[in-house]
């Protein structure tokens, strides 16, 4: 079952544990779609920086992106 990351402590734990998380944004139909997944490299109250599988880096705003990790 997915766990949504909301608080700074959630992102801190994900970064320390090097857990892959998914970044989801609303599509035109109003459904959440995955736009990226990766490891949290840096975060602030405004944005999260993810390092993807291929090594590229992307930034996502926390106010319009939902972040989830899957519980195993």
Residue spans for each PLM region:
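Short glycine-rich, low-complexity segments
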Residues: 1-33, 54-72
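Beta-strand secondary-structure signal
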Residues: 20-22, 37, 49
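Short beta-strand-centered aromatic/proline hotspots
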Residues: 34-41
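Basic/aromatic-rich interaction segments and small domains that mediate binding to polyanionic partners
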Residues: 41-60
